[in-house]
From Swiss-Prot:
It comes from Candida albicans (strain SC5314 / ATCC MYA-2876) (Yeast). Keywords: ATP-binding, Cytoplasm, Glutamine amidotransferase, GMP biosynthesis, Ligase, Magnesium, Nucleotide-binding, Purine biosynthesis. Pathway: Purine metabolism; GMP biosynthesis; GMP from XMP (L-Gln route): step 1/1. It is found in: Cytoplasm, Cytosol. The gene is GUA1. This is GMP synthase [glutamine-hydrolyzing].
């Protein structure tokens, strides 16, 4: 797919056939967009309160998500009735189906019993377009309310033991409702059902791919930035900032300026790795700033994790602004844009009907730079999920080991050194972390683990080395498995592996007397210790 600059609109939803997901606050809403994209149909999520008249594009179809409310409650959210004037297919899921019935004036009420968990779907009308090729199978229920009457113009196409209206359809209007959640993996044929809706009923083209995205996004960036404006962006050595920087390089060449700030609390050999990958390997215009002493000086005596985060965030902005001011654009141009590696989950959280979630920890980003430097924001990855960013990185030639690198927090090792952050403490955490990651890679486990690291605890423990009593510090190892980082399970290593890692750390890292392994899931714990 080749994209002409003049023909490319700013919104991705104007480039690709798009299914609009209207979110009523379900914990599963984001999974609907993920499932649709898995079979190459572009989907975008907006809050259920979205005014259809304000859309600048027309969706190929609309999905109403589930939600934790009762449609008959006084404060229940309701969809803009103009969705029915678009003449596009509509699918209501759980609360979404009840919303369709409620709009049609038919009974929705509290069920005799709530239905949470697996249920058996009985397909009553296999000729229904939505259920084409879908057999009697397990589905996932999560509801307390249910339909008590069939809306006018609809017929029953599926049932379950507790839901006589488990699936309803108005074939002439292409409007469908299902009481279960096809977006979760527990619904065995859920993906098939969603594909029936998006591809067969809505006739959406299956042209959403990273190959096509590259062409259209590069053209979009060129159109947005223009022929002379320049862009700056912070890079960290992580996958998001590297992929973002690479696509900017492909779009505008050396008019993109990447700034890497070494804050003194990075991973082992991080700065050298960033130079080698971005500057030498990917040809990105890179400025490296050694500000470790400044950051560590400002962190002196600070033990509170929130204060650490804020000090690092504010110091980063200060250093970044100073370095950006030194960049001298070519004649006739000026720096107008700031690159930020926003991903689609960040967008979803900000636009969800439920609103942004409660802040558990302050997130380290460059948002403050926009106001201070009077820059416009450019976010080339804002439509992508993490797995899509990784695929994009591979297509752009970003090295595989970087594309699949584990996440690293913005405040770096400062929040993995519990207590005061000093050069000596950082060195201990850094060396222990490097050994842990090295052994994980040797064991072929790195891609199976979502994130792994070593944290230095603010306690000391008695030990024996040689014939001498020691009283030194404790390292806690953490490794987790997760799909979305909203919940996570601890990774189960073989005992021999942990024994080897612990032995290496105690023997090779000065100042460590004991190694522990964190077996706490999220929740109740967070991934990081601070």
């Amino acid at each position: 797919m080749s994209a002409n600059i003049d023909d490319v609109p700013i919104e991705v939803s104007k480039v690709f056939d798009t299914i609009l997901v209207l979110d009523f606050g379900s914990q599963y809403s984001h999974l609907i967009t993920r499932r649709l994209r898995e079979f190459n149909v572009y989907a975008e999520m907006l809050p259920c309160t979205q005014k259809i008249a304000e859309l600048s594009w027309k969706p190929k179809g609309i999905i109403l998500s589930g939600g934790p409310y009762s449609v008959y409650a006084e404060d229940a959210p309701h969809v803009d009735h103009d969705i029915f004037k678009l003449g596009v297919p509509i699918l209501g899921i759980c609360y979404g189906m009840q919303e369709l019935a409620w709009i049609n004036g038919k009974g929705v009420a509290r069920g005799d019993k709530r239905e949470y968990g697996p249920a058996t779907l009985n397909v009553e009308d296999p000729e229904c377009a939505l259920f084409k090729g879908v057999d009697h199978s397990q589905v996932w229920m999560s509801h307390g309310d249910k339909l008590h009457a069939l809306p006018t113009g609809f017929k029953v196409v599926a049932t379950s033991d507790n839901s006589p209206f488990c699936g309803i359809s108005n074939e002439s209007e292409h409007i469908y409702g299902i009481q279960f959640h096809p977006e979760v993996t527990h619904t065995v044929q859920g993906k098939k059902l969603l594909k029936n809706f998006a591809v067969d009923i809505c006739q959406a083209k299956t042209n959403w791919s990273m190959e096509n995205f590259i062409d259209t996004e590069i053209a979009r960036i060129k159109k947005l930035v223009g022929p002379t404006a320049e862009v700056i962006g912070a890079v960290s050595g992580g996958v998001d900032s590297t992929v973002g920087a690479k696509i900017m390089k492909e779009a505008i060449g050396d008019r993109f300026h990447a700034i890497y700030v070494d804050n003194g609390v990075m991973r082992k050999n991080e700065t050298e790795s960033v130079k080698k990958t971005l500057d030498e390997g990917l040809g990105i215009n890179l400025t490296v700033v050694d500000a470790g002493d400044l950051f560590l000086g400002r962190l002196k005596g600070v033990t509170d994790p929130e204060k650490k985060r804020k000090i690092i965030g504010n110091t980063f902005i200060h250093v970044f602004e100073e370095e950006a001011a030194k960049i001298k654009p070519r004649d006739g141009s000026e720096i107008e844009y700031l690159l930020q590696g926003t991903l689609y989950p960040d967008v979803i959280e900000s636009i969800s009907f439920k609103g942004p979630s409660q802040t558990i920890k302050t997130h380290h980003n460059v948002g403050g730079l926009l106001e201070d430097m009077k820059l416009k924001l450019i976010e080339p990855l804002r439509e992508l999920f993490k797995d899509e960013v990784r695929h994009l990185g591979e297509l752009l030639g970003v090295p595989e080991d970087l594309v699949w690198r584990h996440p690293f927090p913005g405040p770096g090792l400062a929040i993995r050194v519990l207590g005061e952050v000093t050069k000596e403490q950082v060195k201990i955490a850094r060396e222990a972390d490097a050994i842990f990651i090295e052994e994980i890679k040797k064991a072929g486990l790195y891609r199976q683990i979502s994130q792994a690291f070593a944290a230095l605890l603010p306690v000391k423990s008695v030990g024996v080395m040689g014939d001498q009593r020691t009283y030194e510090q404790v390292i806690a190892l953490r490794a987790i498995e997760t799909l979305d980082f909203m919940t996570a399970d601890w990774f189960i290593f073989e005992a021999a592996f942990l024994k080897k890692v612990a032995s290496r750390i105690v023997n090779e890292v000065d100042g460590v007397a004991r190694v522990t392994y964190d077996i706490t899931s999220k929740p109740p714990a967070t991934v990081e210790w601070e």
